[in-house]
Amino acid sequence: MVEKKNLRIVYMGTPDFAVEALRCLVEGGYNVVGVITMPDKPAGRGHKLQFSPVKQYALEHNLPLLQPEKLKDEAFVEALRAWKADLQIVVAFRMLPEVVWNMPRLGTFNLHASLLPQYRGAAPINWAVINGDTETGITTFFLKHEIDTGEVIQQVRVPIADTDNVGIVHDKLMLLGGRLVVETVDAILAGTVKSIPQEEMAVVGELRPAPKIFKDTCRIDWNRPVKRIYDFVRGLSPYPAAWTELVQPGGESVVVKIFETEKIGESHQLVPGTLQTDGKTYIRVAAEDGFVGIRSLQLPGKKKLKTDELLRGFRLTEGCVMK
């Protein structure tokens, strides 16, 4: 058995979700010989270059770093080869070309935030909550050509509460993911891995995809049932946030982001999207089979507020519609 201090690991990742597993490896005494993350991006009003969370961690811990624009670039491939990795680990990064993932002698594994083969794609946590699932999980799997299809190494299941939003589920999976990455490395070191092809895994129901989420994806359809809208808002909160168009009786409209709702099972004959409010404490919107109570929302250029806070400074009247 190879000792962990002699196993040369290259780690690839970009956002906060990827920092936890890197931290677990470094603090656990594993030999991370290099880190690969996205190039710096301009952000904010001053367009200052912003480091990715993984880069920030790597710099703080003096880890060698590469930030390639193109993963097939010869200079990058040679620099990666010079690190002589035995194993590569990928968490929330990019799709890798074969020349990269096939390089280490022990292969490359990925941490994916779903119970594969469910929710292959870029936004698995969002879609699990949007679809009202009561359970999700994390998976480690070996990379192969098609995205998120490689043989599964290990999985951990995680319950989703009816009150959880995507931020809460993200943080649960992030913490468990760090531990699962370490357990997967240990299993590879011990030679005890028995990976399973995804097509041989038992799946309940149909396979659901997890495509990238765009602005248009986040628009609320008030013609849907209350439960579906409630789950939709949870699955996009706090980021990127569900939104709707608030149309005043005079015709002027603003885009409103909605972060928290409640289900109100009260029948009505109203057109979906019809807004009701007392102007002080509550806003509720007609849906297909009841009302959606709005608990937390944000107007353009303003901060996120509870409904009663917003109504103190923003006049809403009967006759408003959400579209």
Task: Outline where the language-model segments fall.
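Short beta->alpha connector loops
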Residues: 14-17, 69-72, 92-95, 264
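Residue-level detector of anion-binding/catalytic polar loops
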Residues: 31, 64, 135
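N-terminal Rossmann-like dinucleotide-binding module
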Residues: 2-46
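Donor/substrate-binding cores of folate-linked one-carbon enzymes
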Residues: 7, 28, 38, 87-212, ...
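Internal anion-binding site segments
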Residues: 202-323
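N-terminal glycine-/serine-/threonine-rich beta1-alpha1-beta2 phosphate-ribose binding loop
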Residues: 42-86
